[in-house]
């Protein structure tokens, strides 16, 4: 069966846009010199015991690494107040940096680029995760509405104006640490209802100081974080993830188009900014089928650099996005979680493993983490690049 798929793939390989090489145009020194356009999206996995990256993460990431591929880590905390889920990694201490180094080295040995996603949850937390049991911090003191899944979010404390520079500096120092750990760059997490987005969106920002009110004021904190991180490690090493259309964690904006456009405008001020990674609006159901709404086109046209689309893409939709010039690269989450050799499966148009959502956030170092099967068992060899798509 695999041989049949291989023959078919070789016949029409050039017709698979996801598996074409990508290099940033007009940037001869760019880090983004990729053999394909299938990215590992950042996904929280809750297996970094005591917030320290563990050796089993090296296997998880190298299973999904290919020569000339790009991986983004799970969300990684920038400070002691950044945590909102159990056993998520940090990049704020010497111990964290030293623990990341062998993981990053293992990914690099496979020939892949590795980006560290920098994260602060803000109010998406509870007192139990916070230092000394204090309230989580946010743009607001309004708590998140209970979600019906048993998650408890404590009432947050509104950050004072004079405290915000310290949070900005936490991101800067985390970026420095990530580079010291060997990462090729960082992705600032400005999406999915977490701290930066709590400031950006008008449903969760009720401030009356210079960080609230107008669109410019609401985005000020995020822009300061971007500027600080760029100043520390260089724009060529900094990307960002944004989700202006989403409504996660009670973070909704009354004008997502204006929000997204303003943020892209700020990114364009940094000539060599690594990439803009944006999440699609929620899926629509058309004729009984889930359909991506492709709401990111205005931002794609506006942004001057590499554009990454995410949000429910499959092989067909990803190929179309690249072929149409809608996105340069496509980030895959659950599909990549369940199919560690996803680029190879796309190349062969092979069947996919089904993911098990019951093991997404458990703490088992193997089950639901590194035990999803490859098409061929010999791909488990960490030093084998045969699961990379052919160029």
Swiss-Prot record:
Superkingdom, taxonomy of origin: Eukaryota
Residue intervals passing through the bilayer: none
Binding site for substrate: 189-192, 282
Cofactor(s) for this UniProt protein: FMN
Alphabetized InterPro entries for the sequence: Aldolase_TIM, OxRdtase_FMN_N, Oye-like
Gene Ontology MF: a single term: oxidoreductase activity
Keyword entries, A-Z: Fatty acid biosynthesis, Fatty acid metabolism, Flavoprotein, FMN, Lipid biosynthesis, Lipid metabolism, NADP, Oxidoreductase, Oxylipin biosynthesis
Active site: 194
Function: Putative oxophytodienoate reductase that may be involved in the biosynthesis or metabolism of oxylipin signaling molecules.
Family designation: Belongs to the NADH:flavin oxidoreductase/NADH oxidase family.
Protein name: Putative 12-oxophytodienoate reductase 6
Source organism: Oryza sativa subsp. japonica
Upper lineage: Eukaryota, Viridiplantae, Streptophyta, Embryophyta, Tracheophyta
